[in-house]
Amino acid sequence: MILTYQNPLPIKNIGDPFVLRAPDGTYYCYATSAPDGFKAWTSSDLVHWVEAGYVYKRTEDSWGESDFWAPEVVLYNGKYFMHYSARWGENQSLRIGMAVADSPAGPFVDVVNRPMFDLGYAAIDGHVFFDDDGRKYFYYSRDCSENVVDGRHESHLYVAELNDDLLSFKGDPLLIAQPEQEWEQRSGPEWMWNEGPFVLKHQGRYYLMYSANFYASRDYSVGYAMAESPTGPFVKAAYNPVLYSTVPEISGPGHNSVIASPDGSELLMVYHIHTDSQKPSGDRQVCMDRMGFREDGSLYVIGPTNAPQEISSAKD
């Protein structure tokens, strides 16, 4: 059966959307969505969405105090693990934490009452990747708020192999990407970003998708880099970005995740855009467009779109 949808999807006033398909076929969209935690939305077909309320909410004992951003959820050993960013009450610096739940609908509870790691700098946008050999990797952004390079504030991407607890690293994180391409420097010379990592494996190659430029600017866009190993070295595509503002009505498409269509025949990039394209801000909404790989291995996105699109639903 074919369904029709049109961007933006009915998930609004959010940022950094991540979509998970649960074993029962229900889709969960987690996002930056509340000042004190995270809400989720559910769907049976990726087209029709219903708000499910809070799935994680801070308490008086929580290590995170504010700025709850970019939740991602994975199913592992029968439980659901959420990695998220927040501002640490101890020092007001951004860190990444992990919470666990028995259901994708929560409630998620912090595994420990502290960030999952503290390397003395601000870190956000955690992403877990499971490789075919069973090894697990954690990607994140070293935030520009506390990373000054040659007088510029820069966000850099790192990776570390995870232990089985999904909480601790097997070794020191490795630097894998930093702003260097022309399109990544359009928000000005003093602040530059590589953030929002998401990794896919295709025909033995590792594709690191990421966003660059200021999130509340029209120039926020998605690029990617390729490697033969999950830890790099990653080489950025020469024709980046692959998702960017192409018409006045669409501003700042970025911070993506990827999900298969209900029938498994297509890959879909889920991302956010600014609600008001003429006044970009933290008020964003969810969009979704097809993506894929060319014969030469290069990645493409058919978007951003704002006209009706068809999607293949689960088989009858």
Regions found by a protein language model. Give the residues of each.
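Carbohydrate-active catalytic/glycan-binding domains of CAZyme proteins
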Residues: 1-316
